[in-house]
Amino acid sequence: KSGALALYRDDILEADIKKYGCLNGNFAVIANIPYYITGAILKLFLEGEPRPSRMVLLAQKEVAERIVAKDNKESLLSISVKAFGEPKLVQKVPRGAFNPPPTVDSAILAIENISDGKFVKKGLEIRRFFEILKAGFAHKRKYAKRNLETVLGVERLNEIWRNFDLDEK
């Protein structure tokens, strides 16, 4: 530990972040992570407490691209991350930059302005949000409305669709 910078070596999935004095928004996570636990790390820091104000990760390029996807390319992963912060692909890192080179390309992924503010402002429970989101992506070939019926119920869903003038597709 030196002034404002503190480095910790720990198992990121097992560590008690609070023991390091980290509070919501007063720390950043900057890491070269094992690619196979990217989802678990994002879930831990975005959905859990305390939350960092930002994350900068070296991740598998394809995963980073899925996270920053827009329009019709959105996924459960990209919406999950965007619900808490603003992801940005900073730079692609070719496999040749490493020795020995891995079998995949990498990318630097930054997630800024991390908070649960969107949930608090709208009075949403994080757990319920993800329940609905997962139902929406449950069956790719089905219409979103059909996927959501099991979670929200037909009557409530019809009301939402009418109120927002949504296309059933």
Spell out what each predicted region is.
Residues 1-131, 135, 162:
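Catalytic cores of RNA-modifying enzymes
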Residues 113, 133-169:
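C-terminal lobe and adjacent flexible extensions of AdoMet/dcAdoMet transferase-like proteins
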